[in-house]
Amino acid sequence: MEYQYPLDYDWSNEEMVTMVKFYEAIEKAYEKGIIREELMGLYRRFKEIVPSKAEEKKIDKEFQEVSGYSIYRAIQRAKEVEEQKLVKI
C-alpha cells in the first residue's frame, strides 16, 4: 500500500522517525500482529510528541483516511490484551 503518513514538519528528524515507526506498528497490528509492549512503548513515545488529545484525534483521523487503520482501535485493543501477548485486529 502506498500512501503518505501524516507528519508535522515542525517535528525534529528524530520525532519524525519515531512517528513513522509508530504508524508502522499500527499497520503491523492490523496486518500481522505485534507484541503488546512494543506497540505500547511506541504509543508512549507518540504521546510525548503529541501530548494534546485534539492533535492525537486529528492525526488518527488523517492516518485512518490514508491507510484505513485506526490508531484509537489499535491502542484500545492493546490495552485489553495481556502482557507479552500479540495485538491483532
Swiss-Prot record:
Top-rank taxon: Bacteria
Pfam (any one): UPF0223
Coiled-coil annotated residue ranges, if any: none
Family annotation (HAMAP family): UPF0223
Family: Belongs to the UPF0223 family.
This protein's name: UPF0223 protein BCB4264_A4064
Taxonomic placement: Bacteria, Bacillati, Bacillota, Bacilli, Bacillales
